[in-house]
UniProtKB/Swiss-Prot annotation:
This is Atlastin-1. Residues 1-34 are annotated as: N-terminal hypervariable region (HVR). Its main location: endoplasmic reticulum. Residues 412-439 form a coiled coil. Residues 1-449, 493-558 are cytoplasmic. The gene is Atl1. The modification N6-acetyllysine is found at residue 395. Changing residue 258 to R: Loss of GTPase activity. No effect on oligomerization. Phosphorylated. Phosphorylation, by different kinases, of the N-terminal hypervariable region (HVR) regulates the ATL1-mediated membrane tethering step.
Length: 558
């Protein structure tokens, strides 16, 4: 039900608000607080607290309202939660001119503190969703999200990428919180994290994300670019400019960022003062914060959260309600819980992999060129023993070449790439053996010679057994001779036309097994292997008849 109340809130001052509350959850504002909805476990897996999300996003007052999701992300210990609490003050007191509150009032809301260790983990959402009237009279729900800082000492790169990407995918306004400047590594990390988010989303011709705001804290160069949005716009234009004299890598980073976000802006914020930075007991009282910071803070927060600045969350051009946002939250986290996406890698690991793969490619290419000189297409047949000797020598040279290349990652990291090189060289050697054998005139004639021998033997046996009256054996030999003759003609056609090459390979394998000078067991094994490998070809060539009664063996004629 709707309630109008004048409450003393924890951010200082009285405010009169009209809010919708479900009959099940009539709680005063002061009991609202941060709720962790994305939990990063000790094993670096992710868990979504669906029950908490349901309570927040499916309350009767907001579930069918279009939602504005505001998120703050960036490196850890850079004041994200501190900033979020000033956003809360504004949301609770925005109708008041002096919304920042009493100068002696401690700052409360999302948990924050000074120091060097992380405070926020996962993703936290403020438990009260604010209902705000936009300029066109439409009432929208505003959701505030605080995120775990990136690159702390307890998180993997995948943890940081997932939290940043997920918050960017869910939010309609993403505040990228940076300290002192926008450096090239900040842009590269943004490129990595947004690409990790784009991978998890459906492909679309639209830009996947909405508003990105670079918030540069502790800005120390107001004489170059003034504090605020105007100075930030000029600064960002220069920083994200793509020019022809830039390296291709730098151009790609900037093009990628522009391709991901519909709106990109920047705000330059001064340092809050030495008392804030050095006092271990600082609790957020405005009286201890520099006036220049407070002055620009009063500009920044309304610039972000005033009704005309709110961007309704859209996905593929469709406006999303709180109910819909809940479903997207569930769908996205399932993707990151699985193994469908590649794990992001550190710059060292990615460089080391590229380094080792390049060394593998160089060594493999060297082996290939030397083998081509020995038994390439225009070279004559080489004795198998000589070919094997050359192979072993060149393989050893390639391994030495790989070991001699300076590679990042160390010996242990390079070991699996050495194994990969040896495996790929062995595969190439098998291909060279086949290529070399094809030049042997006796090898090329093996199949027709074998089939001719089979035809001759079965012809002789059929003649002898027919002469002495063993008609069944004679008929069987005649049948084998006929099938062999058909096989020979088929093989000749395949060699001439180049069609049905797989069937030709089967015939060659069977002939090779019959030709084999080794033991009978080896020949039978080769026959069995050929049959098992190409069984589907036999089934296509000789389809089994549909259920018919078994024919009785042909009786001997009297």
């Amino acid at each position: 039900m709707a309630k109008s109340r004048r409450d003393r809130n924890s951010w200082g001052g009285f405010s009169e608000k009209s809010s919708d509350w479900s009959s099940e959850e009539e709680e005063p504002v002061r009991k609202a607080g941060p709720v962790q909805v994305l939990i990063v476990k000790d094993d670096h897996s992710f868990e979504l607290d669906e029950a908490a999300l349901n309570r927040i996003l499916l309350s009767e007052a907001v579930r069918d309202k279009e939602v504005v999701a505001v998120s703050v992300a960036g490196a850890f210990r850079k004041g994200k939660s501190f900033l979020m609490d000033f956003m809360l003050r504004y949301m609770y007191n925005q109708e008041s001119v002096d919304w920042v509150g009493d100068y002696n009032e401690p700052l409360t809301g999302f948990s924050w503190r000074g120091g060097s260790e992380r405070e926020t983990t996962g993703i936290q959402i403020w438990s009260e969703v604010f209902l705000i009237n936009k300029l066109d009279g439409k009432k929208v729900a505003v959701l505030l999200m605080d995120t775990q800082g990136t690159f702390d000492s307890q998180s993997t790169l995948r943890d940081s990428a997932t939290v940043f990407a997920l918050s960017t995918m869910i939010s309609s306004i993403q505040v990228y919180n940076l300290s002192q400047n926008v450096q090239e590594d900040d842009l590269q990390h943004l490129q990595l994290f947004t690409e990790y988010g784009r991978l998890a989303m459906e492909e679309t011709f639209l830009k996947p994300f909405q508003s990105l705001i670079f918030l540069v804290r502790d800005w120390s160069f107001p004489y170059e670019f003034s504090y605020g949005a105007d100075g930030g716009a000029k600064f960002l234009e220069k920083r994200l400019k793509v020019s022809g004299n830039q390296h291709e890598e730098l151009q790609n980073v900037r093009k990628h960022i522009h391709s991901c976000f519909t709106n990109i802006s920047c705000f330059l914020l001064p340092h809050p003062g030495l008392k804030v930075a050095t006092n271990p007991n600082f609790d957020g009282k405005l009286k201890e914060i520099d006036d220049e910071f407070i002055k620009n803070l009063k500009i920044l927060i309304p610039w972000l959260l005033s009704p005309e600045s709110l961007d309704i969350k859209e996905i593929n051009g469709n406006k999303i309600t709180c109910r819909g946002l809940l479903e997207y939250f569930k769908a996205y986290i399932k993707i990151y819980q699985g193994e469908e996406l590649p794990h992001p890698k550190s710059m060292l690991q990615a460089t080391a992999e590229a380094n080792n793969l390049a060394a593998v490619a160089t060594a493999k290419d060297t082996y290939n060129k030397k083998m081509e000189e020995i038994c390439g297409g225009d070279k004559p047949f080489l004795a198998p023993n000589d070919l094997q000797t050359k192979h072993l020598q060149l393989k050893e040279d390639s391994v030495k070449l790989f070991r001699g290349v300076k590679k990042m990652g160390g010996e242990e990291f390079s070991r699996r790439y050495l194994q990969q090189l040896e495996s790929e060289i062995d595969e190439l050697y098998i291909q060279y053996i086949k290529h070399n054998d094809s030049k042997n005139i006796f090898h090329a004639a093996r199949t027709p010679a074998t089939l001719f021998v089979v035809i001759f033997i079965t012809y002789v046996i059929a003649g002898v057994t027919g002469f002495i009256g063993l008609d069944i054996i004679a008929s069987l030999c005649n049948m084998i001779m006929g099938l062999t003759l058909i096989t020979l003609c088929t093989w000749a056609y395949i060699r001439y036309s180049g069609e049905y090459r797989e069937l030709g390979a089967v015939i060659d394998q069977v002939a090779a097994a019959l030709w084999d000078q080794g033991s009978t067991n080896e020949a039978l094994y080769k026959l069995y292997s050929a049959a098992a490998t190409h069984r589907h070809l036999y089934q296509q060539a000789f389809p089994a008849p549909k259920s018919e009664p078994t024919e009785q063996p042909e009786k001997k004629k009297i």
